[in-house]
């Protein structure tokens, strides 16, 4: 339980549902340890409509451990690709929400390829990236740094970038073209902002949803930290 929120310790600092398909109801578990000297009731506040949570057991005695089981209802996700939110761990009865007890949530809904024709299946687009991980080092709070990735369609039909999103405000993205003919390429510019790095939890990364059936989801990780 490496992450601490008040007297409560958790095994994760973010809640992630990586590859969800429409109609699925995946679950994940957040392990909870009560290091306070009183009885604790684990509650997640401000749950979005597509998430539900149950604490097992409902109450934790002093020094006891338990878990919160979280279920994602994919039918209630608003769109394809990335949906993010924040939930808040209640540390005690009547707790308020704030930065200290915030837990970021992300869910990625994948496109459905079950209806594509045999012709499309045999001649798919294929995405190729010049890099899938960027090393940007340390940034001062007033500094920003940009890197460019080349995206190429090495497949047999038009490649569509259907969705392009960042997981948090530490990054910005610019994409020249959303549709690439076979053999064509384009530039994706990723910028890291030092001033926002201190505020965010989790790894800064970029998500792309494409119509390449073999690579419907691509995550670009950006290794960057703020100078203390």
Region roles according to the model:
Residues 37-65, 156-185:
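Surface-exposed binding patches on compact interaction domains or structured appendages
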């Amino acid at each position: 339980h490496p992450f601490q929120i008040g007297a409560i310790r958790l095994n994760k600092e973010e809640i992630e549902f990586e590859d969800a398909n429409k109609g699925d109801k995946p679950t994940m578990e957040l392990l909870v340890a009560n290091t306070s000297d009183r009885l604790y009731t684990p509650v997640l506040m401000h749950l979005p409509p597509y998430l539900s949570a149950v604490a097992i057991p409902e109450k934790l005695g002093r020094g006891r451990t338990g878990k919160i089981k979280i279920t994602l209802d994919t039918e209630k996700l608003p769109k394809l690709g990335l949906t993010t939110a924040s939930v808040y761990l209640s540390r005690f009865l009547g707790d308020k929400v704030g930065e200290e007890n915030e837990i970021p949530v992300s869910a990625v809904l994948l496109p459905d390829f079950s209806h594509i024709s045999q012709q499309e299946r045999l001649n798919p687009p294929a995405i190729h990236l010049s890099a899938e991980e960027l090393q940007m080092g340390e940034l001062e709070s007033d500094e920003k740094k940009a890197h460019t990735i080349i995206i190429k369609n090495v497949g047999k039909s038009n490649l569509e970038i259907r969705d392009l999103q960042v997981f948090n405000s530490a990054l910005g993205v610019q994409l020249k073209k959303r549709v690439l003919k076979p053999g064509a390429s384009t530039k994706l510019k990723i910028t890291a902002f030092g001033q926002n790095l201190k505020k965010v939890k989790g790894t800064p990364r970029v998500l792309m949803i494409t119509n390449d059936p073999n690579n419907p989801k691509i995550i670009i990780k950006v290794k960057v930290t703020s100078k203390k």
